[in-house]
C-alpha cells in the first residue's frame, strides 16, 4: 500500500505509506534521540545517587529503592518529566548533603 495522488493504493510498500502520513519524521527521530539520551543520563545519575544515599543513611536507601521503581515505571511510559520528578522527590524526602 502507498500514497498515489493523495490516495492510499495497494501497490506500494509500507515505506511509502509512512512517507504519506502527516508526521514530521525528523522531529520524531530527534525527540526519540533526546528521550534515549535523557534515559541514559537518568541511569547514570541513579547509580551515583543510590551509592551516596546508602552511604548517607540506610533508611534513605530504602526510600531510594521505592522512588527508583516508580521512576523506572514512569520512564517506561515515557513521561518526559521523570528525571525532574525523581530529584524533586529525593531532595524533598530528606535533607542530605551529597558530595559528588
Swiss-Prot record:
InterPro entries: Helix_hairpin_bin_sf
Gene3D superfamilies, sorted: Helix hairpin bin
UniProt keyword annotations, A-Z: Plasmid
Protein name in the entry: Uncharacterized 11.3 kDa protein in psiA-psiB intergenic region
The organism of origin for this protein: Rhizobium leguminosarum bv. phaseoli
Amino acid at each position: 500500500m502507498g500514497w498515489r495522488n493523495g490516495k492510499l493504493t495497494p501497490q506500494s510498500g509500507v515505506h511509502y505509506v509512512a512517507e504519506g502520513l502527516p508526521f514530521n519524521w525528523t522531529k520524531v527521530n530527534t525527540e526519540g534521540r533526546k528521550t534515549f539520551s535523557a534515559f541514559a543520563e537518568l541511569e547514570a545519575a541513579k547509580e551515583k545517587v543510590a551509592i551516596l544515599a546508602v552511604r548517607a543513611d540506610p533508611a534513605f536507601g530504602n526510600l531510594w529503592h521505592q522512588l527508583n521503581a516508580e521512576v523506572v515505571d514512569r520512564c517506561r511510559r515515557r513521561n518526559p518529566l521523570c528525571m525532574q520528578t525523581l530529584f524533586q522527590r529525593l531532595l524533598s524526602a530528606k535533607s542530605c548533603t551529597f558530595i559528588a
